[in-house]
Amino acid sequence: GHYNKYNKIEMEIFRNGELIGYNYYFFERNGEETIITNQFKFSVDLLGTTIFQVESYGEEKYIKDQLISFNSKTLQNDKEKFVNLELNKKTRKYDIKGSSFNGEATTNNVIGNWWNHKILQAGSQISPISGSIKEQVVTFIGKEKIDLYGKIYDVDHFTLKSKDMNIPKDKRLDFDIWYDQKNLRILKVSYSRMGNWAVSYTHLTLPTSPHV
């Protein structure tokens, strides 16, 4: 898979230009099995009081390139959300038990995590927080250059939106995504919801580097 190159991807989360959290992906390999662990945490403060806080831990398991399980737990303020997904070997579909969805999903769905550029090729994604299935439309906007932490990248700019834009705004997909095609990785994601948010790639640890 395209993720065989990485040991760790680090991203930072900004709101209105202020750093408020992190989003890390860790990659472990054992033969044909790859386990990708995701940890993210952010909090929004207003006048010294935390008004919104999210902390999440998730684990995706692949055999070769096939997702076989995904489990996550998320604390949003004091509300617990979860996903337990398994590939059903008989039906060849995903069985999902989630905080906002219980049922089946086809294997064309991608877990909505930013390490995986296949999210740009999928017709629908599974929420990594609640397990809900969201149909999406990805549109190529154009080729651009972006500056991240003083480094210039050549990127393809896409929008990723819900197929049905009439669903409530807090459930809707509406992202701008900047993608480094040469290295098959998403470098930046932005969206607006209670402010302007951005998730930016900061650092990549490769298996060959000495400090792993």
Language model features with spans:
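Acidic, serine/threonine-rich low-complexity disordered tracts
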Residues: 1-89, 118-204
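Short, flexible active-site-adjacent loop segments at beta-strand->alpha-helix junctions, enriched
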Residues: 91, 100, 208
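Acidic/charged, solvent-exposed loop-and-adjacent secondary-structure segments enriched in E/D, K/R, S/T
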Residues: 94-109
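Single conserved hydrophobic/aromatic residue that forms the stacking wall/gate
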Residues: 203-212
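Beta-strand/loop-rich accessory regions of lumenal/periplasmic or secreted enzymes
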Residues: 106-122
